């Protein structure tokens, strides 16, 4: 195979054949202009291997790819870095878009609910990036109540098939695009009639829900407690009909109380809003149980950030590198899911959630090192047989404390009655509540602020700069006059410059791009 020898991913190459990689490289115009020792095809598989071995450096990952190949030369790490830069993120994104999509057959347990394929939107905000100037300029820094996060984090929105945890699509946002419904709107074209979208309260926006309906898909969303929906008609299962804007919906209001084997009890009230209007075909109690499937997307994210990455920070120090790395990671994840679902569906009646992601990943790693089954026609293969040999027991209902070991996290100390250890749930009591009928919307009351909101930091900075708008202002000088920590302000000045609000005239000096034309104070 010569220079193409390292262009493989072990047995997973069957799901990402070299012909597909070459075609994507040609379409994205990233095929090498002349044949080198490191052709573009090899670069694609090398990037996927970087995601498979996140704790290893470039040279060690190359050694994994060539361990089963006699006489393969190791290039320098600089040559491998140059290969990454030459490829860019475009071919990896295109590859992900090719392999992304639903994997489960409608007959496979857990894939569909009464003929509707269940999918879910959610955001992943815990993939850490190196703390470099370029990454901070793109991603910003998250400010918690007790300080800044140690690393910038990627903002990833995903659409997942809950039955198999396969990815249907993903979108990436920066510091100026952290809103989950806005990111999810970029993925709405992936929805189809025959899909049921499960959503948490962050997506309870009438405009966003109307957009979902326009795709032909149905939805089941947990509504915010601040909503005051009309109760237009009571239904026999305890739910009721209502409207959101011009959208006809059905609402289930239920109290859930879970009792653990240790006697602990945890409860919460749920307001579920759906476009499944037939209460005979989709009774309220059934929808309440179905909403739990939304958490399958959290399990998918767990596999990404912990099983694959094992908590490691990503490698890249700038936006193109991070995007390239992310698309490679998502592609690798999808290939593993393809192998797992292929294996599970050879045993009819087996739920895909019984397949061990850890088993699939570790077996795939072994196959990369051995360089085996690259061109085998056996799709079940070593990975599939390992998955079937280690099927997990059917899931049992459990709960535990929601706690994150991070002093700046809002989940550091939770006092919601959940037990400290994972506890089996013995009973789940569901009480459906039906509110009183209403025919007119509740009157809106105007809330007058007793005192105006304090000026934002950006407004204070711009106000000060506008006192002398024609001279460059030093960032440290601004911080001193406004009594702001210098390192915090300098980071924000760089971000405002990227957004076009300021111009950097020299090192550490800035001018406001829109000096005032009236006495009206600037707004943010």
Report the location of each language-model feature:
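Short acidic, hydrophobic short linear motifs in intrinsically disordered regions
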Residues: 470-481
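Short amphipathic alpha-helical interaction segments
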Residues: 484-495
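Short, cationic-aromatic polyanion-contact patches
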Residues: 450-458, 474, 504-524
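Active-site- or DNA-interface-adjacent structural scaffold in DNA-acting proteins
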Residues: 75-140, 213
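Short, leucine-enriched amphipathic alpha-helices that occur as contiguous helical runs
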Residues: 40-43, 454-462
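Glycine-centered, phosphate/nucleic-acid-interacting loop/turn motifs that mediate DNA/RNA or nucleotide
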Residues: 500
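Single, function-defining residue in the core of a domain
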Residues: 1-58, 86, 95, 115-116, ...
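Short helix-capping/hinge SLiMs at alpha-helix to coil transitions
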Residues: 52, 466-470
């Amino acid at each position: 195979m010569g220079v193409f020898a390292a262009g493989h991913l072990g047995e997973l190459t069957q799901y990402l054949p070299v012909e597909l990689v070459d075609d994507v490289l040609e379409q994205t115009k990233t095929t090498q202009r002349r044949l080198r020792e490191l052709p573009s095809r090899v670069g694609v598989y090398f990037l996927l291997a970087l995601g498979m071995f996140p704790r290893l450096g470039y040279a060690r990952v190359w050694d994994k790819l060539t361990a089963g190949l006699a006489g393969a030369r190791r290039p320098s790490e600089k040559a491998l870095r140059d290969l990454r830069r030459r490829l860019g993120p475009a071919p990896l994104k295109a590859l992900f878009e090719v392999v992304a999509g639903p994997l489960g057959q409608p007959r496979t347990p857990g894939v569909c609910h009464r003929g509707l394929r269940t999918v879910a939107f959610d955001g992943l905000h815990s993939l850490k990036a190196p703390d470099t100037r370029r990454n901070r300029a793109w991603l910003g820094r998250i400010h918690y109540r007790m300080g800044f996060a140690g690393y910038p984090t990627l903002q990833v929105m995903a659409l997942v098939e809950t039955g198999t945890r396969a990815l249907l699509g993903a979108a990436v946002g920066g510091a100026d695009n952290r809103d989950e419904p806005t990111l999810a709107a970029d993925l709405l074209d992936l929805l189809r009639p025959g899909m049921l979208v499960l959503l948490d309260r962050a997506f309870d926006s009438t405009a966003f829900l109307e957009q979902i309906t326009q795709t032909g898909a149905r939805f089941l969303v947990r509504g915010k407690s601040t909503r005051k929906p009309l109760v237009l008609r009571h239904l026999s299962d305890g739910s009721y009909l209502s409207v959101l804007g011009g959208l006809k919906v059905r609402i289930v209001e239920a109290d859930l109380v879970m009792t653990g084997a240790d006697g602990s009890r945890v409860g919460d009230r749920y307001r579920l809003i759906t476009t499944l209007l037939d209460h005979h075909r989709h009774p309220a109690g059934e929808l309440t149980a179905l909403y739990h499937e939304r958490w399958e997307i959290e399990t998918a994210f767990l596999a990404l950030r912990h099983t694959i990455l094992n908590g490691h920070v990503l490698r890249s120090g700038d936006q193109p590198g991070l995007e390239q790395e992310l698309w490679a990671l998502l592609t690798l994840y999808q290939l593993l899911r393809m192998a797992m679902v292929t294996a599970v569906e050879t045993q009819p009646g087996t739920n895909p959630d019984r397949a061990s992601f850890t088993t699939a990943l570790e077996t795939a790693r072994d196959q990369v090192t051995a360089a085996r089954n690259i061109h085998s026609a056996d799709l079940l293969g070593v990975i599939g047989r390992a998955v079937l040999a280690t099927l997990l027991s059917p899931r049992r209902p459990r709960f535990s404390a929601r706690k994150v070991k991070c002093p700046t996290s809002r989940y550091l100390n939770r006092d919601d009655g959940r037990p400290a250890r994972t506890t089996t749930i013995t009973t789940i009591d569901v009480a459906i509540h039906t509110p009183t009928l209403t025919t007119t919307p509740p009157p809106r009351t105007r809330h007058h602020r007793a005192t105006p909101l304090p000026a934002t930091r950006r407004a204070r900075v711009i106000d000060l700069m506008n006192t002398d708008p024609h001279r460059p202002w030093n960032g440290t000088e601004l911080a001193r006059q406004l009594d702001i920590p210098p390192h915090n302000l300098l980071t924000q000045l760089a971000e405002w410059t990227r957004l076009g609000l300021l111009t950097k005239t020299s090192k550490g000096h800035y001018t406001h791009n829109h000096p005032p034309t009236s006495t009206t104070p600037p707004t943010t």
